[in-house]
Regions:
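Glycine-rich phosphate/ribose-binding loops and adjacent secondary-structure elements
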Residues: 5-126
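Long C-terminal interaction/binding lobes of large macromolecular proteins
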Residues: 182
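Single conserved hydrophobic/aromatic residue that forms the stacking wall/gate
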Residues: 185-194
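Structural signal for well-ordered, non-membrane alpha-helices
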Residues: 60, 171-174
């Protein structure tokens, strides 16, 4: 049913910091407006990880199962996996693009800082297991060179490599959900995720 007389997607945002009672109170007040899904806001803003995940788990157990759950502003790969294991369906975050601008590249082998001198002569692919061709084609030394000379193409390569990594991770998780095999294995590989 349209609330405002026109078609819209409305996700009420559940607030309340890391206070479980305030979160549940807000959730109960917002449920009548949850026509399309529910957003979890106000997390990943400086609190420790465990209280954040405790709130996500609490809300995951109390939100409707038939609507998407959207965790706002959370973007580290390990946080995505942990939130998915607690029932979250959707995310948004600037982290892949922002970190790419600073030379941090998410790869299937782990996170690298392309500005480190170790990559100056590294002719191996940026990410040999990426789903995008140029991450498998261009070398780490070439990407580092582009960053050193402030060539915009380097930022594009880094950003798209990071976004591809995230898409690959989410697709892998989707496959594991479909096969009923999703577990904490993803987060037990500290070198793989930041």
């Amino acid at each position: 049913k349209s609330i405002y007389g026109h078609s819209q997607t409305l996700f009420p945002i559940i607030q309340g910091g890391i206070d479980p009672d305030e979160r549940l109170k807000c959730l109960n007040q917002m449920l009548p407006y949850a026509a399309c899904g529910i957003a979890i806001g106000g997390l990943s803003v400086g609190e420790k990880k465990e209280p954040m995940l405790d709130i996500v788990e609490l809300l995951g157990k109390n939100m409707p199962k038939d609507q998407p759950r959207y965790l706002m502003g959370v973007g580290k790969p390990t946080d995505l996996v942990k939130a998915i294991l607690r029932g979250v369906d959707m995310f948004d975050c600037v982290l892949p693009a922002r970190n790419a601008r600073n030379g941090q590249i998410f790869t299937h082998e782990g996170v690298i800082n392309i500005m480190n001198s170790v990559y100056a002569n590294d002719t191996s692919p940026i990410d040999k297991n990426s789903s995008i061709d140029f991450a498998k084609t261009f070398s780490k030394s070439y990407l580092r060179h582009l960053f050193k000379v402030n060539e915009m193409f380097g930022l594009r390569i880094a950003t798209l490599t990071n976004i591809a990594y995230y898409l690959d991770l989410i697709n892998e998780i989707k496959n594991e959900i479909n096969n009923n095999t999703l577990s904490l294995v993803h987060i037990s590989e500290p070198t793989r995720h930041a």
